[in-house]
Structure formats: structure tokens, C-alpha cells
Amino acid sequence: MPWIQVKLNATSENAEQIGDMLMEETGALSITFLDAKDTPVFEPLPGETRLWGETDILALYDAEADMDFVITQLKASRLLEEGFAHKIEQLEDKDWEREWMDNFHPMQFGKRLWICPSWREIPEPDAVNVMLDPGLAFGTGTHPTTSLCLEWLEGLDLEGKTVVDFGCGSGILAIAAIKLGAAKVIGIDIDPQAILASKDNATRNGVADQIELYLPQDQPEGLIADVVVANILAGPLRELSGIITSLVKPQGQLAMSGVLDTQAEDVASYYAEQFDLDAIVEQQEWCRISGKKK
């Protein structure tokens, strides 16, 4: 069935209030917030909804909804300036699942590593292939931070090594490490959903018996590894630098991402005393910081 979409421009101060009003008072089926001016949002606090200075609101209604009523309610709310601009358009129904699946293709990292959705044919059956579908937790290889970490892992000799994936998300880095030769991987994440997603993806890839998964409070005492990869955010990389450093054996390797180019030098300074750091690698304004422990 067709749908009707209303598009409005708001600010970070009133966007949530407008969205709530549209849901509660006009029967909107869903509300989407979009960046109106290509402005990045950095690291919201836990439980916080961080919005752009100028935010587009998309409200979706069924085809029978009374748009005159919706606009009247918006005017009456006084949440927007008088004469506010808006756009109403009809959206034809689509096979959204098929369209979503069509957007994901096998991706190559380095010379031998591929990340493949399960519904696609594997391009190189003899390569190192990780089967991973977009799902509940962050990390499918499409984001530059994940890509930077995968390329780094692919370039290491992981044969027989122990690896810690700190902030394992979907488990993509942990699974890739096993497929690239690591003997054992320990995945750690603060989100129980990420632990479940990692476990499910490890099972799909036939490596569940080689990956241990823990919430931070449950991880083994004295945990130490040859290789540690932490694809999280700049704030936690600073705050947890002592913990992350302690996970790396002397002469072990560390890589971190989830860091913007404007944050990279500052984050690196937290590790410079304990590590011989490599040159910072950048991809689409995201960075990887890596090095060997002294």
C-alpha cells in the first residue's frame, strides 16, 4: 500500500518535541531524523539522543491520513515558526527487504580477506571468507573504521596468535582474526546484544569454539594477548587506555579506530609512552592508530 511522508526542517532544540507531537497527536507511524546540512555528530552520551543543529524530520503516515489535520496540529503546537516550510509526498510501496539486500555486496580487504553477505555468491572460494549479514550490532565492513581494522588484521601474521577484540560488536573482527590464522580470540563488549550477535555470527562461520565472548565484568583476570584491536570511540579509548594497554603483551600489536582525524593525535598521545606507534592511517576522515608495545 502507498504511504504519505511529511518533511519538515527543525533544530536540535525542538526536533524531538516535534517528533513526539507528530506521533502522539497526529498518528504518525514513524519518525526519522536526518542531518539537514551534512554536519557530523560526535559521541552522544549514554541514553542521549544527539541531533544536528539543523535537522530534517520525516514523518510517515498511511495513505488515508488527513494531511490538513497534521499541518493544523503543527501550527497549533507553536513548535515551528509561522509559515514554516514543509513538503508532503506520496511514497509507493516497495519490496524494502529486497531493496535493502541489494545494497550489500561482497567486500575485499587487503589481498585475501572477503566479507560476504550470505545471499551473495562468494567471489573467491579459496580466499579467506567471512560470512556476515547486516544485523543487530555494529560492524559489517561498510564503515571506514571497520574497514581500517580489517585491513590491519589482514596484514598481520596471526598464525597461532591470541587476539582480543575489545568492543566486538557484531564479531566481524574476531571472526576475521580466526579465519586469518589466530589460534584463539577473546571478544569483549559492554552490550549483551553484541555478545549474542557475535556468538551467532561465529556459529554461522564455524568458529564458535575458537572465540570466547565476555561482558567486561566477566572477562578472565590477567587477560593478555599478542594482538589487540579496539574499534570503539575516542572517548573510551582515552578513558580506558590503561586497561587496553594492559591487554597487550610486550612486543604485541595494538590497533584502534572509531577515531576522527581531529581526535587522532590526542588519542595517540595516551599510548605513545607504552607503544612505538605507526603513522596514523586515515579513511574518509576516520583514523586508525596502531603500534607495537615496548
UniProtKB/Swiss-Prot annotation:
Q: What is its EC number?
A: 2.1.1.-
Top-rank taxon of the source lineage equals Bacteria
Keyword Ribosomal protein among record annotations? no
How is this protein annotated for GO cellular component? cytosol
What is its subcellular localisation?
A: Cytoplasm
Q: What is its main location?
A: cytoplasm
Positions that bind S-adenosyl-L-methionine: 146, 167, 189, 231
Q: Which InterPro entries match?
A: Ribosomal_L11_MeTrfase_PrmA, Ribosomal_PrmA_MeTrfase, SAM-dependent_MTases_sf
Which reaction(s) are listed as its catalytic activity?
Answer: L-lysyl-[protein] + 3 S-adenosyl-L-methionine = N(6),N(6),N(6)-trimethyl-L-lysyl-[protein] + 3 S-adenosyl-L-homocysteine + 3 H(+)
Q: Which GO terms describe its molecular function?
A: protein-lysine N-methyltransferase activity
Concerning Pfam families, the annotation shows: PrmA
Q: Which keywords, in A-to-Z order, does the entry hold?
A: Cytoplasm, Methyltransferase, S-adenosyl-L-methionine, Transferase
For biological process, the GO terms are:
methylation
**What function does this protein fulfil?**
Methylates ribosomal protein L11.
Record-stated family: Belongs to the methyltransferase superfamily. PrmA family.
**HAMAP family of this UniProt entry?**
Methyltr_PrmA
| Protein name (database record) | Ribosomal protein L11 methyltransferase
Organism name: Aliivibrio fischeri (strain ATCC 700601 / ES114)
The coding gene here is prmA
